[in-house]
Amino acid sequence: MDSKVVIYTDGACAGNPGPGGWGALLQFNDTSKEVFGYELDTTNNRMEITAALEALRILKKSCNIEIYTDSKYLQQGITAWIHNWIKNNWCKSNNEPVKNADLWQKLYAELSKHTIIWKWVKGHANNSGNIAADKLAVQGRETAIEILKCRG
């Protein structure tokens, strides 16, 4: 597992909930790959999780990964909160169900395949990787908005 991949992720939503998009920039050596997607009715937090999940699903072998996100919800959720959620059968300490548990469970399943360091970066702060991921997420969101316009 000596492949090091750097991933930048972001999510975007028009309204919360509303049409949303996710984007990810994957970098390996001198190669980069941009990916994005959308959902017609979603939340910003679901798009943040989806960006990380879909980026990890692209990787075909075990890697050392650094994931950069401007979402404290994603970074804290996957590095700190998730362990208690699992212990509490996907409930928070107040016994309320964890929001987005379906996505958290899928993301957690991807973790065992890799060695991952999660890093938070300030959004919209001149970080080129974060800016690229944001543009991809916005592209996904705008695609969702256009589809909804076509449907009337």
From Swiss-Prot:
The keyword Ion transport does not apply. It catalyses: Endonucleolytic cleavage to 5'-phosphomonoester. Binds 1 Mg(2+) ion per subunit. May bind a second metal ion at a regulatory site, or after substrate binding. Its EC number is 3.1.26.4. InterPro entries: RNase_H, RNaseH-like_sf, RNaseH_domain, RNaseH_sf, RNaseHI. Its cofactor is Mg(2+). The keyword Zinc-finger does not apply. Monomer. Endonuclease that specifically degrades the RNA of RNA-DNA hybrids. This is Ribonuclease HI. It comes from Rickettsia conorii (strain ATCC VR-613 / Malish 7).
